[in-house]
């Protein structure tokens, strides 16, 4: 494959490949979409085991719509099976199949309807303005830790009824859990070191939840935790609630903060698009929002497992137990679906991106909340800090699962 490496010869579990050259990586995925869209990637040159890498938008959609053939509950949804000692904490609804998945999703979705989230708009607006008021007075900040991370974290904390004093702990714990392959968050990068740190962070979050749940049973407030512990036959078990809590505080702040940060980088790098949106915000609010999610693709991949022998994907026959990895980053650059996919275009419409997963039972539960947070945030930023811009290169998370940004210097004229 001249001009690009082969995915099959460059294992996608090799973190150095993901961080060596972004342009080379994009060329590799593009070449595969054209010539070899479903390569079998071996975990090492000496191993026969591996996974099928799906690089085309249509394959990602198809697999997502066929949960009876491609399961989520067999070993988890990341490339490698989770260690047994972590499954107790990490197995949430994203790692389940129906009917259990449908039962739990119905319960936890009570607090995430479009109607209930629209009622949060004023809370989000107030939170954005509060965060802006806390920015350093010298006109320089770490956009991630000072702005992008606090917004979704405070909103999800408010929804759950988590007191503000726990905010920093949740930020640090979710960094450990979702950024486990990065030495900034877990210095001991041995398998034992990672498992120990992730377990400790997970246990800390569960202990926080247990304290909150006990309080809500005695003193219900109407927040999401109060709804989940309300006495009815469909309630979550304590173990189910613990896993959901870890998922919600993690996905509810990590993925959104990364979309926000990549959005700021894109708007800085494409000032014409920034000005177009700023000058007529309402006309482009929805399309710009969706383009940021496509451009960012905060979650790089999820995995499915083949449910039985003889499952067909296109002309490829698959075997029970084989792993199939959906590379959303590649699907969101598919030239057969998106015109000029490497162009950031706030007017792009339609925009059938797969940044929230694809159609099917596992479409992101928090998609509506994430969209609302971005729409509100950038509107207020354009009004309050019109010259806010990224300054320098982002410090990227070492991961092949999350397209994360740990730090991003930014400048602005103080208010």
Residue ranges and their predicted role:
Residues 1-415:
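Cytochrome P450
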């Amino acid at each position: 494959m001249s001009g690009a490496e082969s995915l099959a010869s460059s294992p996608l579990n090799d973190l150095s490949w993901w961080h060596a050259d972004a342009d080379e990586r994009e060329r590799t995925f593009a070449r595969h979409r054209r010539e070899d869209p479903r390569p079998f990637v071996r975990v090492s040159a000496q191993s026969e085991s591996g996974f099928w890498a799906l690089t085309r938008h249509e394959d990602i959609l198809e697999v997502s719509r066929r949960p009876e053939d491609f399961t989520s509950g067999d070993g988890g949804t990341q490339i490698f099976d989770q260690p047994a000692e972590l499954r107790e904490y990490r197995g949430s609804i994203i790692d389940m199949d129906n009917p259990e998945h449908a039962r739990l999703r119905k319960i936890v979705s009570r607090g995430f309807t479009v109607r209930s989230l629209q009622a949060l708009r004023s809370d989000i607006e107030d939170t954005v303005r509060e965060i802006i008021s806390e920015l350093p007075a010298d006109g320089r900040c770490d956009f991630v830790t000072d702005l992008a991370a606090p917004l979704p974290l405070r909103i999800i904390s408010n929804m759950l009824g988590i007191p503000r004093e726990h905010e920093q702990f949740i930020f640090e714990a979710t960094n450990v859990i979702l950024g486990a392959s990065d030495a900034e968050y877990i210095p001991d990068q041995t398998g034992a070191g990672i498992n120990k740190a992730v377990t400790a962070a997970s246990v800390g979050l569960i202990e926080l939840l247990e304290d909150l749940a006990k309080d809500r049973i005695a003193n219900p407030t109407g927040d999401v935790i109060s709804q989940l512990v309300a006495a009815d036959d469909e309630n979550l078990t304590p173990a189910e609630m613990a896993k959901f809590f870890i998922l919600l505080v993690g996905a509810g702040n990590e993925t959104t903060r990364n979309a926000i940060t990549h959005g700021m980088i894109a708007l800085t790098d494409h000032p014409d698009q920034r000005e177009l949106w700023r000058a007529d915000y309402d006309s482009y609010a929805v399309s710009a929002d969706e383009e940021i999610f496509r451009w960012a693709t905060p979650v790089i991949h999820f995995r499915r497992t083949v449910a039985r022998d003889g499952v067909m994907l296109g002309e490829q026959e698959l075997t029970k137990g084989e792993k199939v990895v959906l590379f959303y980053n590649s699907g969101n650059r598919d030239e057969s679906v998106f015109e000029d996919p490497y162009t950031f275009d706030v007017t792009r419409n339609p925009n059938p991106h797969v940044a929230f997963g694809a159609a099917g039972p596992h479409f992101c539960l928090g998609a509506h909340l994430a969209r609302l947070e971005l729409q509100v945030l950038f509107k207020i930023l354009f009004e309050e800090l019109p010259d806010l811009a990224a300054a320098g290169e982002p410090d990227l998370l070492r991961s092949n699962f999350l397209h994360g940004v740990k730090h991003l210097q930014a400048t602005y004229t103080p208010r």
